[in-house]
Amino acid sequence: MAALLVRGCALRPSWATRSAPICARGEGMKGNFAESVCLGCTSLRLLNYRNACFRSCTAARPVYVASRKGDNEFLWTDISERRYYKYLSSPASWTALKMGPWDLSVRNLHLSRPLFDDSVVEKSLKSLKDKNKKLEEGGPVYSPVSEVETVKKSLGQKVIDEIKHYYHGFRLLWIDTKIAARMLRQILNGHAMSRRERRQFLRICADLFRLVPFLVFVIVPFMEFLLPVALKLFPNMLPSTFETFSKKEERLKKELRVKLELAKFLQDTIEEIALRNKAAKGDVTAEFATFFQKIRSTGERPSNEEIVRFSKLFEDELTLDNLTRPQLVALCKLLELQSIGTNNFLRFQLTMKLRSIKADDKLIADEGLDSLTVTELQAACRARGMRALGVTEDRLKEQLKQWLELHLDQEIPTSLLLLSRALYLPDTLSPADQLKTTLQTLPESVAKEAQVKVAAVECEKVDNKTKLEATLQEEEAIRKENQEKEMERLADAAKESQQVAAKVDVQSAPEEAISGEMKTATADTAAEPAVAQMSASEQAEILKDTAPVLEGIKGEEITKEEIDILSDACTKLKEQKKLLTKEKEELSELKDDVQEYSEDLQEIKKELSKTGQEKVLQETKASKILTKRVNRMIGQMDKIISELENEEKVLDEHIEKGSVPPVGENLVSINELISIMRHIQKIPEQKLQRIAAALDENKDGKIDLDDVAKVVELIDKEDIDISTSQVAEIMELLQKEEKLAEKEKAKEKVEKEQAAEAQN
């Protein structure tokens, strides 16, 4: 930890990477955001911010309306008309403002998994292939664990262990049920959920289906059957600002949206509970516990094989979510990112940077190290926290080659590799020793999460006590995050109130100036002798602030409110153009996930057949039932999309020709986007131009609505203020990742075709 603190204080000169950095160097960032996301990785948050100009009432945020209770609160009235209150100084001074559903909208329901994330089934398949590969090479699958004499338990001890097992199991079931009910209530009320909450909700649903498999037969059909009723009773689940020509079209779009998100969430749940190992005895979890104990307590050095094997479990998201603030600051300084701000803000920067490094690593591996110039090698090494100046070209290539081997070949997470650099470890240490030292600095909270993860990957059971501890630990982290967000919100509200009060004082100043002019003159006259009596030294001690006031990047900054306006603008443009491209794309991705899941199961059976264990690992009954349900929902959604397209064709015949853009046209001009945003809320013209220019990457005056939606989702996920240059960099990163994903899909397709030809 001391090394991390020293590293965090080190000052580094600015540098330029080969690819555009995610957070611009030298640009100030507020860092005052709350990590407010919905159930999914990203979410279009359709929220309009309205300034109420009554007395000193400031901007009210509808997202807090339905969640806060107590004396000082915002309130909803009914569906057709909404009323909210802004607390001023006492309940007697509350000011009310009425708004209809056309003014206020809510966040979109979203339950899908983050992009570019391997499922548990895919990780299990990789682990199985790794084992078989080592067996074929003739080496041991894993390092032998130190043998411990098995002590035969007495009958009384067996009874006590069984009682403890069921006690922790029922307690876990009760806590999971409470948490699931609370989160489901938040979803129905239209509230967004953080990444941590979404991950917790997914794991809890998987645990509930494991503990009580009968729930699959009851909950899923019942939930699907009641979707129309839920949309009627809880309109805040989806935005109510559809500009449709038909009530039927609006109903179908809402039904499609909810079915799509539910199907994606069920598919994620399937992959969590897919496989069960009948012969599992908990050996892997015991090995991990022994490994972590060696590192943290005994000081005994594990084997290199164990270090590399278990280091893969500490994924970037898991590691960043559990790092302390000094460690987050040290990583930001190492990567020369903004190191001032909340923990969530620092995590967002690091997440974007790690994604950028991962994409660059794949590009460098494809192009080869020899294709890089010396300047590019220096920039690449420096971007990864390695020495870049005063080093020969061969040394630069060697450093980068070792990084690529650890990251891409051995699949060591980028966060661990960067943490090892932040510790200023000697270059003479081997990569395994560097990883060992890095794992020693990780908080204890990571161990429980990693232990649950290793059991899921190896398809083994985790004892109920460990699951319960991990669940309670995650709940405590969620509670702390919510407290941070609430404190930040109160600080922002207090700042706004002070600004409003200052404006009121400025307006009332001229009235008091005349009456106080004579008093001021008299006071100044009386004070002149006292000032004259002050010595020269006393006058010299009076401090005067002569520094100029810096405006920073205020003109270039996009606030959270403007991100919401941009989100609304994208939605309205899509409604005007009658686009279903986003829904079609997500449905296509869901079909691909289902197909990949089926192919992974077949590959797992094939790998198990090599060792004669194909009957040991089986698909659970719950996952089979859910798979059938998801396939059925996919068929229903295909019918809804066809019905919507037919409805739009009929409606277009009754509308004047040329008034509606052609269906499927996904490009809009910059002027269209600016016009819609100007209509939603007044924003300075120059700022509108800069926002639109940041979204127009190729500078042709056209913007792809789907690309804009993806950028907005990613930014809105963290609820931050961000500069226009950073928006452009995020768009570039997303497009780079999409190109890499297309290359990987094409490569996999070719490999499958070659394998099929070889079999024939």
UniProtKB/Swiss-Prot annotation:
Residues 254-555 form the Letm1 RBD domain. The chain crosses the membrane at residues 211-231. Residues 463-505, 557-657, 723-760 form a coiled coil. It comes from Xenopus tropicalis. Residues 1-117 form a transit peptide. Residues 118-210 are mitochondrial intermembrane. The lineage of its organism: Eukaryota, Metazoa, Chordata, Craniata, Vertebrata. It is found in: Mitochondrion inner membrane. It is a single-pass membrane protein. One of its GO terms (biological process) is inner mitochondrial membrane organization. This is Mitochondrial proton/calcium exchanger protein.
